[in-house]
């Protein structure tokens, strides 16, 4: 068994040191022995950890790159927009631990993959729906502490504001992975990031952290905001 050093860097998020100088992070396995996307399982003091691959997770990439504000923690209720096959939502569920993570996905085929890979994580609630239409799943999703968005649409920022108005608690947090090329392939990514940030601020968010996630994803920016619509 590999000898590793584990250190908590955020609540329920850990750095794992294999002694090779490479930066790695992990979450405690909510379902020990169960892989979701072929991730490495490691052990320290009889606790199983899932190594979080930043090449397959924008949130993982942001943490590796030095994210300062991580609002997802134990007990946090989360709405995850753009769940895909469940790679990042599975780690978010590990972190939230005893709280619900609503995982929204638009494509039925991908949702089936998500259910197959994550069905043993009882705090992960699959929701089939369109993030542009929060009213369609308002009978399923409760008020949440954090919204995480990874949706490759031209109106990414507007989608976040729309969902925040339906579901985000006052002074709750949102995290959004902005994909510049999904907004406009003709513009400089920096210009797009500034435009999307402006939409978020005008919609009711105070941006408290921004981090580029290259080299893991090209032309992507992670933003973290506090929701206080009444201030704007």
Swiss-Prot record:
The keyword tRNA processing is annotated on this UniProt entry: yes
GO molecular function, one term: RNA binding
InterPro entries attached to this UniProt entry: Fibrillarin, Fibrillarin_CS, SAM-dependent_MTases_sf
UniProt KW keywords: Methyltransferase, RNA-binding, rRNA processing, Transferase, tRNA processing
Entry binding sites for S-adenosyl-L-methionine: 87-88, 105-106, 130-131, 150-153
Signal peptide start-end: none
UniProt subunit comment: Interacts with nop5. Component of box C/D small ribonucleoprotein (sRNP) particles that contain rpl7ae, FlpA and nop5, plus a guide RNA.
UniProt-listed HAMAP family: RNA_methyltransf_FlpA
Family: Belongs to the methyltransferase superfamily. Fibrillarin family.
Protein name, per record: Fibrillarin-like rRNA/tRNA 2'-O-methyltransferase
